[in-house]
Amino acid sequence: MIKDRHIRCILFDLGSTLWTTVDRAKWLSLEETSNLIAVETLLSFTNDREFSSMEAHTLGMLLRKAVEKQIRFGARQNPGYEPDFVLTTVEALQKLGISRANRSLGEDIYEALRIRIPNSRVLFDDTLSTLAALKQRGYVLGVVTNRHYGGRPFYEDLQTTGLLDYFAYEQMAISADVGVRKPNPDIFMHALNRLSVQPEEAAMVGDSLKADILGAKMLNILSIWKPKASLRSEAKVAWMSSYIAARGHQMHSNVAQMSGEMDDAELAEASEGEIPTGFTDDYLLAYVLNRDGQKLQPIQIDIKPDLIIENLKDLLAVF
């Protein structure tokens, strides 16, 4: 696996890999603020009474949902590629009845709906220290990320987080800017070409089996899965449920069949039953594959990651 390969470059996803999202209450507050900016932008363009008479909060939610729905539609039409987000916004506005919507308005509305990274994301505690250690050990570091927003504001946001101390922005592959999204191999090659690295010399770290692991495996990039903490917790609950069920069934069976033939000590020992295998990364992977089987069914390639880690700092025991 690792010992058979000369890895000199490590690529990272961003969301749920290097950072996590703020709590839901704060997210909704940030969303509301940007929604209201979008409403102001719209009302400065049109005096349509249907919109001007609508409560600002309601109109803001309507705008966001309409744009997000149109983006999802565009993504389904051309899998593996990002839609033209401005054009998509114009189409969403036109569907709402704003027939005069143009690219200028679409661009302004779409930008107004952006939620900035420093306010809405938090780096994991071990992110910067792990990146610093890997860089010190001589690894080339890169980013391959699916994002609806890129451009100058995203560059500024990454500067604020401190991540640009470890990544060269011009060598990142950001789907909103590149026009291609994971798992399309082209977005990985975009980053690798800029970093002057061959696929077999690279590793990819990410939280998504379909986007990160599948995309990496299509190019023979070493794939490292860092599942979300919430997913790991969900799988542990499922494992505990199966453990308790198996234990309870065994106890019931033992008691029913042998209670009349054993003394108290023998009965207590028999009631323990066989302890199921402990929670492992293999169980976690099997749980996710079973849960998401329908979504992953069309995939013809083996999606099993080469490595599974819980925390980013676990990479330091590997590289």
Residue ranges of predicted features:
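Basic, amphipathic juxtamembrane/active-site segments
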Residues: 24-42
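A generic alpha-helix surface/boundary motif
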Residues: 36, 86-91, 152, 186
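A metal-dependent, Asp-based hydrolase signature
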Residues: 40, 50-111
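Conserved aromatic-histidine-acidic binding/catalytic patches
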Residues: 2, 22-26, 30, 77-81, ...
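Short, acidic loop-to-helix structural element flanking the phosphoryl-transfer center
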Residues: 5, 78-90, 103-104, 111-142
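Asp-based, Mg2+/Mn2+-dependent phosphohydrolase catalytic module
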Residues: 1-10, 20-22, 45, 51-54, ...
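Receiver (REC) domain active-site loop signature in two-component systems and cognate sites
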Residues: 16
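Conserved catalytic-loop position in the HRD/HxD motif
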Residues: 13
